[in-house]
Amino acid sequence: MKALTTRQQEVFDLIRDHISQTGMPPTRAEIAQRLGFRSPNAAEEHLKALARKGAIEIVSGASRGIRLLTEEEQGLPLIGRVAAGEPLLAQQHIEGHYQVDPSMFKPNADFLLRVSGMSMKDIGILDGDLLAVHKTQDVRNGQVVVARIDEEVTVKRLKKQGNVVELLPENSEFSPIVVDLRQQSFTIEGLAVGVIRNGEWL
């Protein structure tokens, strides 16, 4: 799903909440009334915009013909630049969704992360690539992980011994990142399960 404007997000949230509360979507007239539009036609324009962005499907010929598209139907979310201190999968980090079958990766991918930098180039993870990530904290030494150190997110190979974690690059021009778990905040966000070369699937 492409990023929504503030007004489109209000319409989307109203539809979702209405379905949750009543079991059915609102009519155009109900949307217009709730959000202060002058006419149902204004609501219709916002619905068309939501459909173009992949957030909903409009079923023609029905006053309540609105269907929210699930994450599975939208595809895997693509995470771009992550703001400090915010959840990785926060809506504002999602650049879009790509129709990639999660089951083509083992274990299944939960999201795609846009790679920034060349610290993992020796194993074929390049700047701008899309890294397929399985969301888990169950990881082992030697695996390539997505980790958060304090507020920074990075992709590195994991080496943990006692209270010390080393995040190893796959590029001799970069140094390992050493984390003292007694002094720094450290979280595993997921396990790298595959890579899509930049532009290959887009």
Swiss-Prot record:
Keywords: Autocatalytic cleavage, DNA damage, DNA repair, DNA replication, DNA-binding, Hydrolase, Repressor, SOS response, Transcription, Transcription regulation. Residues 28-48 bind DNA. It catalyses: Hydrolysis of Ala-|-Gly bond in repressor LexA. The keyword Nuclease does not apply. The record marks A84, G85 as: Cleavage. Transmembrane segments: none annotated. The keyword Phosphoprotein does not apply. InterPro entries: LexA (IPR006200), LexA-like (IPR039418), LexA/Signal_pep-like_sf (IPR036286), LexA_DNA-bd_dom (IPR006199), LexA_repressor (IPR050077), Peptidase_S24_LexA (IPR006197), Peptidase_S24_S26A/B/C (IPR015927), WH-like_DNA-bd_sf (IPR036388). Represses a number of genes involved in the response to DNA damage (SOS response), including recA and lexA. Binds to the 16 bp palindromic sequence 5'-CTGTATATATATACAG-3'. In the presence of single-stranded DNA, RecA interacts with LexA causing an autocatalytic cleavage which disrupts the DNA-binding part of LexA, leading to derepression of the SOS regulon and eventually DNA repair. This is LexA repressor.
